[in-house]
């Protein structure tokens, strides 16, 4: 299959998956990418003002823009009725004196019995058994039970954690968000960035305070970032950058810098999970094929020496890179390279160049 393809780097944040060469539908693929995976998902990360013990931390569901932070005031508690308390609980009072109250279960109470849960619990109580309660009877209010241990799951943004709250009251449970203990929050940025964690410590009791919500943004670091340089171009040195002023998207917008112009050189990083090059500003390059050959696709493989190889998916043939007179990058198949006049028609300024990460 003779093919001539241009390398297009569109400034969008959709994930570019490998294209099926026999069922290529770019519009559907792009829509599918937008629905399934975004190039720059935002995960909310919660920090206290420190973080230090004694600072109240809450987990709001609000999000903020990248590279910004915002303070959220918070004061409050949550009440749960005693009817939601599990049976056979041990209640801890503020004086640390345990009061054990066993709620009668179906095995110890005859049918049609009613257990009220609205009256205070005495310091001592005896649990009615099946031998002391007649059918259709009502259990005295002195056998009511008060608050106990509550387990609550809090969901905030992309973080889900479970923590246990313990408190004592007459017929309500005060749930403080958060309670004593450690909460581990995982922050993630991009699809292949190393995952890092931070541990926040908070204290029990209802408090007022501020919480700082920080949303990490995509970005490169010295370990994973690089420039793209072309070896073999007629202009030396020759770097790769994005030309956002291209009017025709089919012509591509991945260009090489002209002589003496290095200000527009972009910084990239390589995502090995999808074998694609991404920019550090959270833009995943979308490599499109030239419209002369809409049924083919190609893979990009990063070699151990930092160079990149372009392989056509349908045939497994290694593609070659060329630079046009205007500095645009082109990919051609071996068949096209062998055609008489094919290369001359385009007028490349450099043939068989190599894309190198450095």
From Swiss-Prot:
This is Putative cell-type specific agglutination protein pfl7. The gene is pfl7. May be involved in agglutination during conjugation or other aspects of colony formation. Induces flocculation when overexpressed. It is found in: Cell surface. GO terms for biological process: flocculation. The keyword 4Fe-4S does not apply. It comes from Schizosaccharomyces pombe (strain 972 / ATCC 24843). Residues 148-218 are annotated as: 2 X 36 AA approximate tandem repeats. Sequence repeats lie at residues 148-180, 181-218.
